Amino acid sequence: EKTLYSFADEVVMYSDIPAGDNEIIARIGDADAVLLSYTSQINRYILERCPNVRYIGMCCSLYSPESANVDIRYANERGITVTGIRDYGDEGVIEYVVSELVRCLHGFGQKPWEGIPREITGLKVGIVGLGKSGGMIADAMKFFGADIAYYARSEKKEAGAKGYRFMPLNELLTWSEVVCCCLNKNTVLLHEAEFKALGNRKILFNTGLSPAWDESSFTRWLEEDNLCFCDTLGALGSTALLTHPHVRCMQVSTGRTRQAFDRLSEKVLANLSEYNG
């Protein structure tokens, strides 16, 4: 926070979430730059009423204009620079996946998944989306002795060098005992055919910010002997599913750790420094 004063003559901080667009407009006022949390959005309506804005720093992940909480295309038309960050909260998410999977397999605080405790050793783990977090989950599972395969938009040489097998999506789903979906926000890959390929007696993790499935197909799959883990309601999709006996949703963002906030702050300030030259 103190470092921000080296970039501007005046800094105004708000610690609460604005109630709506008009409150955001009032808060921005005649500011040249805006720093924005993931909890709020800056749309075209807001930007049209804040003509002085020249820079928007997203203090959250930016993967694509479609998934952003800023109307990036309109901002670019106006000559407004929009920056975002990535890869600041992955470590906590990986720890969550390992922790919940170990508890499930061993039966810590619950019945063991296979009736008797088992290790991750030899477990068939499929990763859907081998980006930064997906790759880290794959590496963690490999460390514990799992057999790793993955689906991504293209085969990755570095993954092959580690012994990870590239598979078509439906083949991967059928092969896997545990599937981890690590996709960008609003990316939906699991529909009726995919859940049919996945089959029953499977464990599904979703570490994304939104559901990786269409809800009707997912709900039917849950009715069988399957289990789904999500850390947040955003990843699960529907409050009605929170009480489903085959859903484990903590409603806590596992990537929001002390270290993640440090990494986030450093990256936001680095973007500001680059913008200022």
Short names for language-model regions:
Residues 7-13, 54, 160-169, 242-251:
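Active-site regions of enzymes building and remodeling cell-envelope glycoconjugates
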Residues 29-32, 42-46, 155-240:
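Rossmann-like adenosine-cofactor binding region
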Residues 107-137:
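Glycine-rich NAD(P)-binding loop of Rossmann-like domains
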Residues 143-160:
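NAD(P)-binding Rossmann-fold cofactor-contacting core
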